[in-house]
Amino acid sequence: RAFARLGEEGIDLFMADSTNAEVPGFTPTERNIGPVIEDVISRTKGKVVVASFSSHVHRVQQVIDAAAANGRRVALMGRSMVRNMGIASELGYLNVPQGVLIDHKKALKLPDDQIVFMSTGSQGEPMAVLSRIASKTHAIEVGEDDTVILASSLIPGNENSVFRVINALIKLGANVVHKANANVHVSGHAAAGELLYCYNILQPRQVPVSYTHLTLPTN
């Protein structure tokens, strides 16, 4: 309704993201992800490591809720993850049940079936927590009975880095769950249906924003 009112007033410029302009339909809701993460955690006998963007507060909230529902505690791993979630908690955007969050050093002493590690490194960054786990240079060790969830999309250009991490984790014996084999992430970019809807109600003189010339004509 707010967009429609703006359209009635007249829009000269609408900056539109073209990343998913070639994806038909509408981007699925984030609500679909929580039950999938909870199911994966419930079926894991050992430890769970979830890697996502350190700024994705809602994804971390879903992991915390899923861990709590399965009687597990959560340790935040990675400086940016700890910092961002600390700010989110202070501002009231992240709701953590009492006793669920635990210091990472104490988490390492818990039985594997009682802990979820929420980490950075979903894009294969070499010095991030997940890459160090995969290369066996981190205190967290994964193997059989353990599950690693990559709750993110591949950013173009990071394919080789991410696949390298996934292969290393599988080689260690871990079960690796990612967007290609489970519904553990939805895009934050508007698909074709949403873009068309916005253009129809706003009718702007628009200037699309694009990463590549591939998606620009579609938008």
Segments and roles (model prediction):
Residues 1-109, 128-141, 160-164:
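His/Asp/Glu-rich metal-coordinating catalytic cores
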Residues 11, 46, 195, 199-211:
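Proline-aspartate-enriched helix->loop->beta-strand connector
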Residues 17, 51, 75-78, 118-120, ...:
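Generic beta-strand/beta-sheet core signal
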Residues 25-26, 51-53, 184-188, 209-210:
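Glycine- and other small-residue-rich loops at beta-strand/loop junctions that grip anionic moieties
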Residues 139-144, 201-202:
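Short, conserved loop/helix-junction motifs that constitute active-site signature segments
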Residues 153-173:
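Redox- and metal-dependent alpha/beta enzyme cores, enriched for Fe-S-associated oxidoreductases
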Residues 173-188:
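Generic long, charged, amphipathic alpha-helical segments
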Residues 212-218:
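Conserved small/polar residues in nucleotide/adenosyl-binding loops
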